Regions:
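Hydrophobic helical h-region of N-terminal Sec-dependent signal peptides
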Residues: 10-15
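N-terminal signal peptide c-region/cleavage motif recognized by signal peptidases
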Residues: 18-20
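Structured, acidic catalytic/metal-binding patches in enzyme active sites
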Residues: 26-36, 42-286
Length: 338
């Protein structure tokens, strides 16, 4: 329950940041997502003498109809000694709390209460008429049979609508690729697995965690939440073709499409600013810096001890000028980019 509440805020950032700076103007023809067996991007290669670090760049969303062709990655994994996962934030829950069926029921009730508008209000009563009309137009276009009142707060309503629209347009999360990738990694039992993560402690009683969730949702700026809602609508209205183009580019291995676009959570992302200003995530910039430092330390160690290492990063972080690949270059490693 708490994990969902935290991720409901972060989801808006992850979902929308992938399309930041993608809009290239309106196309005369609608972009259709590619299908079939597709390889994704080539691997980046970092060299320290005879030692190699191969990096696989992930992206989300990806085309729903693609089947990831994993042979190239499978060969590298078989010949590697270690895999370094992408930087991540994880949550540490009390096992007893999660297994208690009473708490699961209480959690559903709390989640419903915190994600819905107070006093049984509806979305059209809360947001400006112009914004609601745009929301209703998108909803009617994609889901014409739905006309029941929307009682979710703007952030949640906008995020869920955007997720559903992406699925209707043939776009799905990167799990379509990362799940088979993780199966490949598990199959290679000889691999040392290095996870680079910051763990958020969510231990304690249900009451204490519920208070944290209430504080988080209560600390979100109403003005910033409306701005995030408006941005969600704008991108669903005008950038879906660009999102599909980038998803196709990733699936087919066209790396140049990603050069110069911001890392998810850039300063011009209104949903990220909403998250940053919330009480629970006030130190997110420090967390990101710590994760980057840990990943680079793991890469440095691997490049001095392993003959071959496989690593995973967001493709945007591989192609931006101040990303982790650029940091490896400043350390004097030889870089090969596709």
């Amino acid at each position: 329950m708490i994990r969902w509440l935290l991720s409901s805020v972060a989801c808006a950032t992850a979902l929308l940041a992938a399309s930041t700076a993608m809009s290239q103007g309106n196309n005369a023809l609608e972009v259709v997502t590619v299908t079939g067996r597709l390889p994704g991007p080539p691997l980046w290669r970092v060299s320290n003498g005879d030692r190699r670090l191969y990096i696989f760049g992930t992206f989300s969303p990806v085309p729903d109809g693609m089947i990831w062709e994993s042979d190239r990655v499978a060969r590298v994994l078989e010949g590697s000694q270690e895999v370094i996962f992408a930087p991540d934030i994880d949550a540490d829950f009390s096992l007893g709390l999660m297994l208690n069926p009473v708490n699961l029921f209480r959690g559903r009730r709390l989640s419903k209460r915190l994600t819905r508008l107070p006093d049984d209000a509806t979305l059209d009563e809360i947001v400006p008429a112009e914004l609601y009309d745009r929301y209703a137009a998108l909803r009617s276009r994609y889901f014409p049979r739905e006309d029941d009142p929307v009682r979710e707060r703007p952030l949640v309503a906008g995020t869920r609508l955007a997720e559903r629209i992406q699925r209707e347009e043939g776009l799905v999360s990167s799990k379509q690729v990362t799940k088979p990738l993780n199966r490949l990694i598990k199959r290679n039992r000889h691999l040392q697995q290095t996870r680079v993560e910051v763990v958020v402690s969510l231990k304690g009683s249900f009451t204490s965690l519920a208070r944290r969730a209430e504080t988080l949702m209560g600390s979100l700026s109403p003005e910033k939440e409306l701005a995030c809602f408006a941005e969600q609508l704008r991108r669903m209205e005008s950038e879906l073709d660009a999102m599909k183009s980038r998803a196709n580019a990733w699936a087919q291995g066209y790396v140049d499409e990603f050069r110069g676009i911001p890392l998810p959570g850039s300063d011009d992302d209104t949903c990220f600013l909403l998250l940053l200003e919330s009480s629970e995530f006030s130190t997110i910039e420090q967390v990101r810096s710590e994760l980057d430092a840990r990943w680079l330390a793991a890469a440095d160690r691997a490049l001095t001890t392993n003959e071959s290492t496989f690593a995973i990063l967001d493709i945007v972080d591989l192609t931006r000028e101040d990303g982790l690949l650029a940091a490896l270059r400043t350390r004097g490693y030889e870089i090969w980019e596709p």
